[in-house]
């Protein structure tokens, strides 16, 4: 079984948070965790509990599949916006 890349998960959480226009402080309050811990999660330097993981997925409207295995579902509007932004930027560089 593949080992989880917590830094990659943290980057995805940060991207989804920024897509919503939220600060770390706002997301940490919504998930009932400290601002410091939120920063550690986004940097991948601390492992979150399952409760925190679920809260982040719910608040950010992203699936656990995406965070863990890069599977994007059509019901993840934030992820689709992020992906569309990446495609647009990639096309503009060529």
Regions flagged by a language model, labelled:
Residues 1-8:
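A detector for short, charged/polar N-terminal pre-domain segments
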Residues 7, 18-19, 47:
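Short amphipathic helical patch at the helix-1/turn junction of helix-turn-helix
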Residues 11-30, 55, 87-92:
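Short basic helix-loop element that most often maps to the first helix and adjoining turn
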Residues 32-47, 69:
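Recognition helix of helix-turn-helix/homeodomain-like DNA-binding domains
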Residues 51-66:
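DNA major-groove recognition helix of helix-turn-helix/homeodomain DNA-binding modules
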Residues 73-94:
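Interfacial/linker helices and their anchor residues that mediate assembly or domain coupling
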